[in-house]
Structure formats: C-alpha cells, structure tokens
C-alpha cells in the first residue's frame, strides 16, 4: 500500500510540475513537451490496480457530465461516445483530471478510456492520453461549462471545436459547434456511490 501511495504522491507532484512548467505557453507551441508530460501522467493512471485517490484531492474529480440537451455523456469500452438519459449510468461516471489552469482530460471510470476529439471533430474513447484528449474547460455566464479542443479549430475563422451532444444524445461533430449553442453546454454533476450498480460501485471505490 505504501508503494501505491508513493506512486500517486509522485503523480500529484507530476501534475503540479506540469501546471507550473506549462504556464501560459500555448499548447500548440510546445507539442513535444506536452506529449512527454501526458505520457508520464498516463503511465501512472493505468487501469486495473487498486489505488488511493486521496493524494489527488483537488486534481482529480469524479463526476457525471450532463449536457443541456438532457443527456449524460458516456464513454464505452469499444471507443464510442454517446449520451444517455439514465442517471448514474455505468459508463457515465467520469474522472476529470486537471492538467493545468483551465486544461483537463476526461476518462471513463469503467471503460478506462479518455475522451478524445479527432481532426474531423468526432468524439472517441482513447486508450492513451494524447493531445487529442486535452480540453479547455470554460465556465460560461449561464453557469454551464464548455469543453473546447486544444488541438483543433476552424482554420479560417479560428472558431473552436467543442464537445457536444445532439438532441438525440448522439455526439455532434466539433466543426458544427459554437460556444453559445446548448449542444455544447455541460454541467459536471456529483456522483453518489449509493446510486451506482454494485460493479461500478466497486470500481468507484478501488480505482
């Protein structure tokens, strides 16, 4: 157990070092540095071994991500991303990992996959923590949050690609999104372990 605690204490230091080292440098200007740091962090967040997340207080949050269209975002083991109206669904329990001020990655607790967005603006679940899995979290005036890709945006207008869910729960391509659309507005909702299925409850407790 001491070894596990040491690993996550090291992760705590890594994340803090990542935040202070990155500073205000745009991600696009430091791809090599960012990729190296993401690799180090990803290596310490491997799925499957019991862990004590007390060391990550304030850095790692477990939430559901509720879209203004009425769906919770889910990340499935096969890499697909979709929305569900079911509260506390198995694949809708997510880990929010703070990488720097305003920069986060999101990972499914059950699937172990990171939320990613490719160059076409499509959402997917990634086994690796890459630059496609880093999003800028912004608090909007209506108390909702938006999550913009830090890697892809419109080349002509510089308009960002946002995480979004359509009115039927399907993922909306990032190139079709705008900041003030309700498709892009999300609320991170707290997780109540007592409402989770028994299998997911065990994962929530031990991972």
Swiss-Prot record:
List of glycosylated residues: 78
One term of GO molecular function: fibroblast growth factor receptor binding
Residues found modified as Phosphoserine: 111
UniProt GO BP: fibroblast growth factor receptor signaling pathway; neurogenesis; positive regulation of brown fat cell proliferation; positive regulation of cell population proliferation; positive regulation of endothelial cell chemotaxis to fibroblast growth factor; positive regulation of MAPK cascade; regulation of cell migration
InterPro entries associated with the record: Fibroblast_GF_fam, IL1/FGF
Highest taxon listed in the record's lineage: Eukaryota
Alphabetized Gene3D superfamilies for the sequence: 2.80.10.50
Gene Ontology CC: cytoplasm; extracellular space
This protein's UniProt keywords: Glycoprotein, Growth factor, Phosphoprotein, Secreted
Pfam families: FGF
Sequence similarity: Belongs to the heparin-binding growth factors family.
Function statement: Plays an important role in the regulation of embryonic development, cell proliferation and cell differentiation, and is required for normal cardiomyocyte proliferation and heart development.
Subunit field text: Interacts with FGFR1 and FGFR2.
UniProt-recorded name of the protein: Fibroblast growth factor 16
């Amino acid at each position: 157990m001491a070894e596990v605690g040491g690993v996550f204490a090291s992760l705590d230091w890594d994340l803090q070092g990542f935040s202070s080292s990155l500073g205000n440098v745009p991600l696009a200007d430091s791809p090599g540095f960012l990729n190296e740091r993401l690799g180090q962090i990803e290596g310490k967040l491997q799925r499957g071994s019991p862990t004590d997340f007390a060391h990550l207080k304030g850095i790692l949050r477990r939430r559901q991500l509720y879209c203004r269209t009425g769906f919770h975002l889910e990340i499935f083991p096969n890499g697909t991303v979709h929305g569900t109206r079911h509260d506390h669904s198995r694949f809708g329990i997510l880990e929010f990992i703070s990488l720097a001020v305003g920069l986060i990655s999101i990972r499914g607790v059950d699937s172990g996959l990171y939320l990613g967005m490719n160059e076409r603006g499509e959402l997917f679940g990634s086994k690796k923590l890459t630059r496609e899995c880093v999003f800028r979290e912004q608090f909007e005036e209506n108390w909702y949050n938006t999550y913009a890709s830090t890697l892809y945006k419109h080349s002509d207008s510089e308009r960002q690609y946002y995480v979004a869910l359509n009115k039927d729960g399907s993922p909306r391509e990032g190139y079709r999104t705008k900041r003030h659309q309700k498709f892009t507005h999300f609320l991170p909702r707290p997780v109540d372990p007592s409402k989770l299925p028994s299998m997911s409850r065990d994962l929530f407790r031990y991972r």
